[in-house]
A protein has these predicted regions:
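Extreme N-terminal basic, low-complexity initiation segments
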Residues: 2-7
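Short N-terminal or domain-adjacent regulatory/targeting segments
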Residues: 52-81
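Bacterial Sec signal peptide processing site at the extreme N-terminus
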Residues: 38-59
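Surface-exposed short loop/turn segments
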Residues: 136-202
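N-terminal segment of the mature soluble domain
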Residues: 78-165
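Short secondary-structure boundary motifs at beta->alpha junctions and helix caps
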Residues: 183-193, 199-245
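Sec-dependent bacterial lipoprotein signal peptides
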Residues: 9-10, 14-41
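C-terminal, charge/polar-rich interaction regions
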Residues: 245-254
Length: 254
């Protein structure tokens, strides 16, 4: 009996030692994964604004003919029926740039910004132009679509975004595991570039291209910082600024 009890005790002790080794080994794996993750976003990379401008074709939009009001044709007389076309980019997200997804909430925000122009008898109606076959560079096609739906002008809204996610000095405490959940050692910076261009549908009149660049930051622990939060905040501010500029263009007598 004594021999059997001693054997059971030895087996129990061996199992405890094995359990401790497995726990230590698992902890080392988790720690290595955390350190590797921290190394991947340790420093700020900034934004590749050249790639963003290229995606928006801003260099071609910045030509003198696009940056000055066209006087070849008279501007339509108010109140205008304004068709708004939100550009969709069918390109994959990359480390340099990300697509801007235009949601119904974004459209509603822009329309609220333009709503006072109806009280000023400048806008008769504002509606969304939907045509999945049209691209941002097909201005003629967008104007023709606007004419089919009875618009006097079309407003083409385009945008691109980028995220710079990195760790600050507090991230050195992340390997404690608990630190990755409690310490604000991770920052997510978002940049949204947005453009708005106004075109008459029955003449060659167009207004200067309006461009805004808005940055937003979210800071917190690595486990809870969401890039999408920073992107949404930057997008909302961009729509606000762009809507204000478009309203000023429509309020201009020229």
């Amino acid at each position: 009996m004594a021999a059997a009890g001693e054997a059971d005790s030895n087996r129990w002790n061996a199992m405890r030692r094995l359990s401790r080794k497995v726990t230590q080994y698992s902890f080392r794996i988790v720690l290595a994964l955390i350190v590797a993750g921290l190394a991947g976003c340790a420093a700020s990379r900034g934004f590749d604004q050249a790639a963003m401008r290229e995606a928006l074709h801003l260099d071609s939009l910045s030509t003198p003919e696009n940056q000055s009001v066209s006087h070849e044709s008279a501007r339509p007389s108010p109140p205008f029926r304004l068709g708004v076309f939100f550009v969709k980019h069918d390109v994959p997200d990359t480390p340099s740039i990300r697509k801007v997804e235009w949601l119904s909430a974004d459209r509603d925000q822009l329309f609220r910004k333009l709503a006072p122009l109806r009280d000023e008898q400048l806008l008769a109606d504002t509606f969304v132009l939907v045509d999945v076959t049209l691209r941002s560079d097909n201005v003629k096609g967008i104007r023709q679509a606007g004419a089919r739906f009875g618009a006097d002008m079309v407003l083409i809204i385009d945008g691109i975004a980028a995220v710079d996610r990195y760790n600050n000095r507090l991230a050195w405490l992340y390997p404690t595991l608990l630190g990755a959940y409690l310490l604000p050692g991770t920052e997510s910076d978002a940049l949204v570039m947005a453009t708005g261009s106004l075109w008459a549908v029955r003449s060659d009149w167009h207004a200067p291209i309006q461009t805004v660049e808005i940055q937003s930051k979210v800071k917190g622990s690595a486990a809870f910082v969401e890039d999408a939060t920073a992107l949404q905040e930057a997008k909302q501010q961009a729509i606000h600024s762009l809507g204000k500029r478009i309203a000023e263009v429509l309020q201009s007598p020229k």
